[in-house]
């Protein structure tokens, strides 16, 4: 390969793969060893390794095909499924390089070792782990583990939780709307918040101005703390109730509730249990499709197997029982679920005490509320709750159960007493997923006896006028595979006084035609207060015009009602930049009424997401009116390292820092780049879950070298976790080294260049070539091997080229270094 070709190839390779580990001072090791041998006649087969991951300061001259001992960043596969990337120590045993895996590390990978092996390197073979293999060329570690040793891999301990930084941060939103250039409406929302250890103080204030009328309002103030070991969340102050039994209300008081985010899906989500009876010693095989998820031997008698999310992905299960005589029995287990249903043995609760806000209670009365969900065996969940306040009491109980092919059913009965009014509420729900038919059926029926009062109704003194009598809703959905999707929804609501009775039905069909996506909809609505039925037909067509640049799409919609009103709209919309941070939309609408009146409206809007906030503007106008709208949405974070102007922070977020380097893309959220001081805010993380913070390496400038582009955090609820990526700014150079006697340092010689606290490291190849990155200014590079050392200086002139260049250097040995 020509030198120019090699340089270009290495540039591309570097930008794609070079993420050295500066945390362990393993930066800039010579991955050039992969590439340069293509043009040499020596060492082409003896050496094949990724030298980025050699241990820091490892003084090793390569003289055999056996890789060196030390720590390597490897991809770990459990039963051929990638679980994580981690730094693992390796040592030589016999003629192999083997990993040192402690009992704690195996446990973090979801592998249970039920022995007292507390050695630094556990005896995996004695623990029952059948096979461990290391593919050095790709740095992949494969571990084959029997099913009985596997646990929930995503399980997290309290020591893994990051409570984040101490911070004072503000979210703000500013809106202005102008109508006909004279009527003005302004809205400002400010949320000053404090994070201190695991405590969260949250506030929100709003300002509204409608022409000359101005109002300030405080929405809420509350203090929150999570207790991971107890799986509960504490809130003191103004907040909203949270319940699986009752509707939600605003209140001032104290709330203690189970935080379901603290559980893994397999710990909390309902999954079926397999039950049966074996006539003799039998083999039980449970399959999902062609995959065996249970293969166990059982004695004669009843048996039961819980299905965990680790193995089960939802859907129909096939059970096969084979007795000692070879006789087989087979049956199918279908399952469905409802939101109220929980894992067998799990209890979820909410307890609240305080005062209702005046919009729910005329006098801000004291109230208390509690509810419990408990997952039982035999695929059912029991739940119930209570509410009481001044002159009011409500008691509720219910069950949700999975009846197999007929679906999941819920029955809930509540009884209320308010002053002299008594009543009850019955709710029946059903959810069936007919997976063999790619269809789903859901219905919800409510009946209320007159006199039943909800907690929100006591503010109206239990007014029985316009009380709900019954409601019924039905939803059908069917996938037609390549022919699209069909759905039908029906709703009927009836009141005791018949004042607001209504019936509605809609039929929707979605399909694709070539590149176009087409949705048709027919709806029928009947309201008690209107004699005439409202019938509407609509069609919407969306056609992508390009995906290579700008992601531009056109759209057309038409709607016609039996009232004589027809509306049509045509437009084009799109986005610019790879992360779609600049969006735009242009629409032209036309409405024709039965009296012959026609209204034409034009609309144009744009939105830009920057590192410092999201800014929006729009204009709409017709021959009779015009409207302008402007909005700014963002945040300010004050922390120990300074001030960061960011996008609006979500409930849980991450503050990323890359040493004073701007314009580096972080994650997938549009507009999230490092700002002028190297900070960027990732606004939305999942609390108590593993979140990966990823830098988009395609946007990293050539003169920036990052120690790592991916880190993982597990934040507590409401936390702002700080994630720091070490970076070096400087040029990349290939040095051609010779010693004073005309020879070259041997293959595997280690080079070091110290720049402040950073240490750049490289490895010399078999032709005396040394690759270094992140070099700036001037300095001295030391090269060591087998107790010997030589050094050479470099200057700004050597590193001035923006392209990867070759610089010849003589590496001189100090006089006292010996030969």
Curated annotation (Swiss-Prot):
Recorded hits in InterPro entries, A to Z, give: Fimb_usher, FimD_plug_dom, PapC-like_C, PapC-like_C_sf, PapC_N, PapC_N_sf
The membrane topology of this protein is: Multi-pass membrane protein
Record's keyword annotation contains Membrane: yes
* Gene Ontology biological process terms in this record: pilus assembly
Which residues pair up as cystines?
none
- Gene Ontology cellular-component terms listed: cell outer membrane
Subcellular location per the Swiss-Prot or TrEMBL entry: Cell outer membrane
Q: Name one GO molecular function term.
A: fimbrial usher porin activity
Q: What is its main location?
A: membrane
Matching entries from Gene3D superfamilies are given as:
2.60.40.2070, 2.60.40.3110, 3.10.20.410, Outer membrane usher protein FimD, plug domain
UniProt similarity note? Belongs to the fimbrial export usher family.
Q: What does this protein do?
A: Involved in the export and assembly of C6 fimbrial subunits across the outer membrane.
- Family annotation (PANTHER family): FIMBRIAL USHER DOMAIN-CONTAINING PROTEIN YDET-RELATED, OUTER MEMBRANE USHER PROTEIN
Name of this chain's protein:
Outer membrane usher protein CssD
Which organism does this record belong to?
Escherichia coli
